[in-house]
Amino acid sequence: MRKNLLVFVFAAAIACTSAPVFGAPKVSSLAGTLIEEGYTPLTLKRAGNEFYVSCKLNGRPASLIVDTGAARTLIGSGLLKALGLPLTKGEENVYGMIGWAGKNIKAGEIKDFQVGPYQAGAHPVSAWDFSYFGSAGRGSSMDGLLGIDFLHRHQAVIDCFRMHLFLKAPSAPSTSATLSAGLRAGGCTEIPMKPVSHRGLTVPARINGRSGYFVVDTGAAHTLLSQNAIAGLNMRLVSASRFWTRLGVQDVGKNVSVIQKVHFTTMEIGNFSVPPQWVGVADLPHSTSGGTENVFFGYVGHDLLACYVGIIDCAALKLFLRFDPVIDAARRKSRG
């Protein structure tokens, strides 16, 4: 019964997506179904180019970016100091779109971790200096990243199109099989994700016939390809406008000063074909390790995830994408 209900309501939700990306209804039938399954719904907030969720850490308000590109939950060192949180030397390195956070950085535990109305209980965190993200012109203040460790444990489902986050207690029964069946019946392509050391959640990909992988990064506003990865693909780079350059620098912090753009002819993410389009290219931080021999293509950002109605099941490690011709037409028009 639940399976049939989800198939029906998601098909109805798809019918509503013929509006432009930012004109869609705020509440979807998918949301109603997940609430019935015991999920707590939260609406992400936009500030600058980032998407936040309001939290309380040991009773203190904080704004955290929902970031599937962060393997661990990172909290600003200043906030942790203000909380008086005891920190010890961690055993793992932290690496991601922000670059190396350092070897064996300090870590601690938030005893009362609350995301909106959702009570998560205790959760480990790592300390990192986010002060440069609050520079002039950004229009936002970031207290940290809600990483995949938290999202996986609390069975998170992220609706990238409607900007919703759903959380459920780790001990609650899984809804992933029902969710998968409903989304596939609604026309979505299911793509397996893999957690990779120093990266976050990754998906297999091909660009112009070359195999590699992307990091699925909800913490990045824009999709960026690695200049190092596409060097041998005979793709013509052109200088980006100042608008693209500014957005790219904001996405990756101090690691990029110049961003270019490139037009790909064929790109597959799993079995999902992405229509030809321009994307940003930058000299992204990369490591020789990371648990994979494949080529690191870059980051699938929120722009592409929203455009192709992305749903992320963090518990089952699955990404769902769907092509909508009206939404894609709006994308092409906005890009000129």
What residues fall within each predicted segment?
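Pepsin/retropepsin-fold aspartyl endopeptidases
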Residues: 21-336
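Positively charged n-region of N-terminal signal peptides that target proteins for export
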Residues: 1-4
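Bacterial N-terminal signal peptides
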Residues: 7-17
